[in-house]
UniProtKB/Swiss-Prot annotation:
It comes from Azobacteroides pseudotrichonymphae genomovar. CFP2. Produces ATP from ADP in the presence of a proton gradient across the membrane. The alpha chain is a regulatory subunit. The gene is atpA. Its EC number is 7.1.2.2. HAMAP family: ATP_synth_alpha_bact. It is a peripheral membrane protein. F-type ATPases have 2 components, CF(1) - the catalytic core - and CF(0) - the membrane proton channel. CF(1) has five subunits: alpha(3), beta(3), gamma(1), delta(1), epsilon(1). CF(0) has three main subunits: a(1), b(2) and c(9-12). The alpha and beta chains form an alternating ring which encloses part of the gamma chain. CF(1) is attached to CF(0) by a central stalk formed by the gamma and epsilon chains, while a peripheral stalk is formed by the delta and b chains. This is ATP synthase subunit alpha. Its main location: membrane.
Amino acid sequence: MSNIKSSEISDILKMQLKGIDSRIKFEEIGRVLQVSDGVARIFGLNNAETGELLQFDSGDMAVVMNLEEDNVGTVLLGETSKVQEGDRVKRTKRIVSIPMKNGMLGRVVNPFGSPLDGKGPILGKEIDMPLERKAPGVIYRCPVVEPLQTGIKSIDAMIPIGRGQRELIIGDRQVGKTTISIDTIINQKANYETGDPIYCIYVAIGQKASTVANIVNTLKEYGALNYTIIVVAAASDPAAMQFYAPFAGAAIGEFFRDTGRHALVVYDDLSKHAVAYREVSLVLRRPSGREAYPGDIFYLHSRLLERAAKIINNDSVAASMNDLPNNLRGQVKGGGSLTALPIIETQAGDVSAYIPTNVISITDGQIFLETGLFNAGIRPAVNVGISVSRVGGKAQIKAMKKVAGTLKIDQAQYRELEAFTKFGGDMDAVTRATLDKGRKNVELLIQSQYNPLPVEKEIAIIFIGIKGLLSDVPVERVREFETEFLDILEMKYRKDILDMLKQGVLDEKIEKKLNTIASIVANNFK
């Protein structure tokens, strides 16, 4: 037998070992212990994270909500009937997110980015935006000073909204809350056409599919769908989908905000969102508190609404923003904004209930709509007394600030006098004039739905009202006067007056012209 050298043996062994694939892949697999009411308890996923997506063998997905001692509580994103006890579940190691693409504009999607409008797949480069994300820190924000025009006279004049603000729309059912938000979206068409778009996200939570279809058709009819994304979790969808819908809207808005653009997100409505979260929490056996809502219901809405912000206009500072998604790095720009219009439904006008008071305390103001005003034909039915914008005149152009400065006080005085005169008695000339002016201003601020006005026309018509130039026009003909007055301005004075008002200029020369035109038109209505 020939001698074998030890070095040869080691060489042979090394060659043999090189061919061995030692990469062992581990997959954490769990089993469904219990499933009911849209919730599954899973055993065996000891390393699962809160908010992580899990996948069943059937392809259905679930999200981890509870981490308990011997199992994890998850909410199902599909039908409960498709998941059974004993089914295998595996971790995806991905936090729940929405694949954002520029091709999403004009589309109707679910909270996870899947199209619902039957127009085929959504095109464009995909960027995963996490649904849950920390709000920008204080150093990455700047004050709200740029106006977001709603096109609604009473709001733009007395309760102005700025880019980056959170303004609550609150009122009973059927008083025009959704109409205000849709009008605001339609009014952004001019910005889109001039190359300074405000991208709009409308989030429908727990609404009927037919209602959402009507909203889509309205936006399409008025040419607003090109810059709008509609996120839908309908009434027939699982509670988990309704719970995640507003977070999906916020994530889409953050994509525009963090790339230096402007976005507006409407949450319609957060009352149904709170109910969906309560349902999920109760089924997960979380401790309940007031009105059976879980203890963190305030935190649910505060962490959602705090994501609305005006970002500092400095690219290098914005690029270091906290909690940025990795796939967004390198595209971040400063100067963007995300404005939020949450909607809350009250019961019999009770704004002191649990969820309304929570959201009022989180937001930067509220627009309160009243059933009595709506039924009296005063639409939008804004109760100016308890409606407020905490940003105020900072979010108005100079001309609007100048004409609307006294309007809120004037209308409050009118309401007070009107209540007093119901007791009867004689009135002096000043009181009669104040009441007459107040009534005509109320009539001037009435506006039909889906008919937003450009800011320059709002300024012109409010100027006429506060200067008392309608004294010779009967109350019932004020709206006719408004139509004729604005038509004359558009046809003959677009450059001299309207374009100047649009730039915020309202000097003595323009005031004299407006006075003269108003007097001429008023003569036709005596």
